UniProtKB/Swiss-Prot annotation:
A motif (SAPNY motif) lies at residues 307-311. This is Protein phosphatase 3 catalytic subunit alpha. The modification Phosphoserine is found at residues 469, 492. GO terms for cellular component: calcineurin complex; cytoplasm; cytosol; dendritic spine; sarcolemma; Z disc. Its main location: cytoplasm. SUPFAM superfamilies: Metallo-dependent phosphatases. Fe cation binds at residues 90, 92, 118. Gene3D superfamilies: 3.60.21.10. Expressed in brain and thymus (at protein level). Isoform 1: Expressed in brain. Isoform 2: Expressed in cardiac muscle. Residues 56-340 are annotated as: Catalytic. It is found in: Cytoplasm; Cell membrane; Cell membrane, Sarcolemma; Cytoplasm, Myofibril, Sarcomere, Z line.
Amino acid sequence: MSEPKAIDPKLSTTDRVVKAVPFPPSHRLTAKEVFDNDGKPRVDILKAHLMKEGRLEETVALRIITEGASILRQEKNLLDIDAPVTVCGDIHGQFFDLMKLFEVGGSPANTRYLFLGDYVDRGYFSIECVLYLWALKILYPKTLFLLRGNHECRHLTEYFTFKQECKIKYSERVYDACMDAFDCLPLAALMNQQFLCVHGGLSPEINTLDDIRKLDRFKEPPAYGPMCDILWSDPLEDFGNEKTQEHFTHNTVRGCSYFYSYPAVCEFLQHNNLLSILRAHEAQDAGYRMYRKSQTTGFPSLITIFSAPNYLDVYNNKAAVLKYENNVMNIRQFNCSPHPYWLPNFMDVFTWSLPFVGEKVTEMLVNVLNICSDDELGSEEDGFDGATAAARKEVIRNKIRAIGKMARVFSVLREESESVLTLKGLTPTGMLPSGVLSGGKQTLQSATVEAIEADEAIKGFSPQHKITSFEEAKGLDRINERMPPRRDAMPSDANLNSINKALASETNGTDSNGSNSSNIQ
C-alpha cells in the first residue's frame, strides 16, 4: 500500500488564483497600431484592446483627445442634425455598456448618433469611453455628434472619479487634455428642425434658439446662468400637474439652476416652432420617460433618455436609446453587461486588506495588555502611594479600552467589508461618515453622509440588506446629484432671475449664423 503524497505547504505568490480571468494586456498600443496610413483611428483594434482593459501609449491617448477636440471646436453651439438619428443619454464611464449600446443602436459606420453628454465620472471606465468616442468622432465627424453634459467639467471630475482615474491609468496631462476637449463640446442640437436636444433643459434666460447660438461655450461652465441651466436644469417632479404658476423655480435637488414647468416647456416649443425637447441628466428606471403631451401637437413635450444600465451597479435600471426615422420614434431598451471589478475610488488590494491585518494586530495588542491581572498590577504598585497607583491603573485601562475600540473598528470593517464598500461608493468623497465604524454594526445600519458633505441622509442602509429597487438606490444616491460646493456659487440670498439677467457678458455674438427652425413636417 503506497503512502499518501505529502501536501506541499508552499503557496505560490506568483500564480493567479482565478486563472479563468485573463490578465489585462501589459502592452500599450502605439500610434502605428491605432492609426492607419491616412491618420484615421482603427476603432476595431482600439475597441478590442480597451475591452481587455488594455491601455494606450500616453502620446497616442493625447493625440486622440486633441484631434477630437479640434473637430469639436469647429462645430457650432447648436448643431443641426438630420434624421435618421439615434439619440443616447448618460454613459457615466460604463464602457462595457457603451459597447452594448452600439450593438442595440447600430454600428457607428452606418448609423448617425447624437450623445447628450455625461460620458465620465461615477463609473470606472470613463477614460475608455472618452478615447473610444473621440476616436469615433475623428473617423465619423459628420455622423457622430457629442454634446456637453454637466460632468464634462473640471469641478465635477475633480470631485468625483475621472481625474483620479486619469492619473492612475495615464497621467494628469491626459486629464488636462480631456478638460480642454470638454470645453469644445457643443451645448445643444436641433434634430430634424423639430427637436431641441440638450443635456439638462431650459433656462429662463434662453427664449429662442439664437440665445443658445450666442453663448460663449469655450470655458468651464459657471455656477449659474444660461450655460449652467442647459447642463443642470430638470423638469419639476410633478411636471404637467404643477401646483405652482412659476415657470422656473430653484432646483433644490441640484443645489443650482432651476426646475422648469410644463407651461414653460410648452411656451418655449410654441415660440420656437418645435415639437419636443429631448434631454438626459436623470436616471430612469425604464431607461426613458415621456412626459405630458403638448396640447397643440399631441406629442410628448419632453422626453428623458438615460443610457447607463444598472447605474453604479446598484440602480437595477434598464438603459435606452431613441431612434428617430421617417417621423417615427422608437425606444430601444437594453440591460447591463458584465464588466471588470474595481474597488471603490480605485483602491488597491493592499489598502483593501488593511482591516484584516489591523484586526489581527489589535487583537494581539489587546491580548498582550490583558496578560496582567488586577492583582498583579496591584502587587507591582505596592511601592506607589494610593493616588499614583490608581492613576497608573486608569492609564492602563484607558489604553486597553482604546485598543479594544480600534479592534472593534477593524472587526466591523472586516465582517461588513462589502457593505462598507457599498456605502463608500454612495458617499460624495468615498469616505465613511465620522463615527460609523466605532459604533459597530448598529451605527453602520443607520449611517448618514451628514458628517461628510451635506444634510441629506443615506437612510435605511443596513449591512445585511441588499439594494434591490431603483427608487431605493436613487434615494441613497441623492446627495451625489448636487453640484459640489464651489467658490463662485451664487449667493443664497440673491435673486436667481436678476443675476441671470445680468449675465450679458456670457454672450459674445459669435456663432450666430444659424438657421431658424422650420415648421413641423
